[in-house]
Amino acid sequence: PCLGLSRADGLELRAMVARGPVRVRMSAECRDEWRPLRQAVGRVPSGTGSLEFAILGGHMDSWFGQAASDNAAGNAIFLELARVFQRHAPELRRGLTVGFWVGHETGTMIGSSHFVDRFWDDLRENAVAYLQIDQPALVGTTLWETKSDVELHDFHAAVERRVLGGISAYWGR
């Protein structure tokens, strides 16, 4: 478990610790309940009438303090990709679905799970790929991580060599 505190409280605590040992007692209340949430999902249809589609997914929620990189930067990339794909919609052989999931940072992944539960039949029949971008554009990044299934390992390695030009990358699944 972790508890967040304000910057002012953190600075005060740091100053106290600098003067000597400190005992702190903190308490928190956490509500774990179901409630309605809005989840933005956009679709760009294929130009061929194909029902197949790729999914771009990312999360809207964030921890306090890290929202610019986790995941506002990823969502900005999705918005730009959706804009470009929409411009070229008549040429697309497959459609594109862009999902901005809620409930990600709680550890439950409830937004994306709800989407899968609700649209399972369509996903099973027509979804061909899923791409999630989370925490891009971090200044000073020296390690890139790609996760997928083992069938795509060689493909990812080739793309990473070409795009990253020798920067180390980690692949996992």
Which residues make up each language-model segment?
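Short, solvent-exposed loop/turn segments at secondary-structure boundaries
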Residues: 66-70, 142-145
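A structural signal for isolated positions on well-ordered beta-strands in alpha/beta enzyme cores
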Residues: 97-99
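Alpha-helical transmembrane segments that form the membrane-embedded catalytic/substrate-binding core
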Residues: 74-78
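"Short basic amphipathic alpha-helical interaction patches in structured regions
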Residues: 71-72, 113
